[in-house]
């Protein structure tokens, strides 16, 4: 795996101290990876937490790097949303329902971005890929996972609301979610 670190400990999404061109940076990484014979460009996954999650969303919208992403502890920033021209990508979005950094119900955050609500963020992906609008509902402990299938692209959108979790999703009473996230990603 590649574990990149943002300039000045953040990714440039507009409100951060960094002025780095993140799409260019990831183009450089991808170009290098493609020189290796073992690299499978059809199985590239993006996983991000918090600011990294917002970056993974941005890269999924502005490029065709990923076959699937996991956006953890953040949702879409207002003005950075997928459209019908966004390359197909499977999305696992996980948000803490008591997040005091990235508001679950959307709005201005303490990090200087205006976020969509968690549900509208997931529905933006659903609408962009023309998925079935009636989700399958699964429970993981006390957490609800809405699964949107039948997307035109053959992808899937999962919206996982972590009950009683703040910005740190890994709470003592929270089930282990890394296993389900990885199982989701490797299907695409």
What are the roles of these predicted feature ranges?
Residues 90-94, 116-117, 126-188:
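C-terminal catalytic histidine-bearing segment of alpha/beta-hydrolase fold enzymes
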Residues 34-89, 100:
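Primarily recognizes the serine-hydrolase "nucleophile elbow" in alpha/beta-hydrolase
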Residues 104-116:
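Short, flexible/disordered intra-domain loops and linkers
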Residues 1-45, 49, 54-58, 174-175:
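Serine-hydrolase catalytic machinery in alpha/beta-hydrolase-like enzymes
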Residues 29-36, 58-63, 72, 124-131, ...:
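Structured segments of extracytoplasmic/periplasmic soluble domains
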Residues 12-15, 57-58, 80-86, 103-107, ...:
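Short, solvent-exposed loop/turn and secondary-structure capping segments
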Residues 99-102, 167-169:
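Acidic catalytic loop of the alpha/beta-hydrolase fold
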Residues 5, 47, 70-73, 92-95, ...:
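Alpha/beta-hydrolase-fold catalytic nucleophile elbow
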């Amino acid at each position: 795996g590649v574990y990149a670190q943002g300039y000045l400990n953040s990714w440039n999404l507009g409100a951060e101290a960094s002025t780095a061109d993140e799409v260019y940076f990831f183009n450089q990484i991808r170009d290098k990876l493609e020189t290796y014979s073992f690299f499978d460009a059809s199985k590239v996954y993006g996983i991000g937490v918090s600011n990294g999650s917002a970056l993974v969303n941005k890269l999924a919208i502005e490029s065709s790097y990923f076959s699937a992403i996991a956006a953890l502890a953040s949702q879409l920033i207002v003005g950075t949303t997928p459209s019908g021209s966004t390359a197909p990508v499977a999305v696992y979005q996980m948000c803490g329902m008591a997040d005091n950094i990235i508001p679950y119900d959307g709005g201005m955050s303490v990090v200087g971005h205006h976020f969509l609500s968690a549900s509208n963020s997931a529905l933006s992906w659903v609408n962009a890929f023309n998925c079935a609008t009636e989700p399958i509902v699964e429970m993981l402990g006390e957490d609800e996972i809405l699964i949107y299938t039948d997307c035109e692209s053959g992808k899937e959108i999962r919206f996982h609301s972590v009950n009683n979790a703040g910005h740190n999703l890994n709470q003592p009473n929270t089930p282990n979610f890394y296993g389900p996230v990885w199982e989701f990603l490797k299907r695409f």
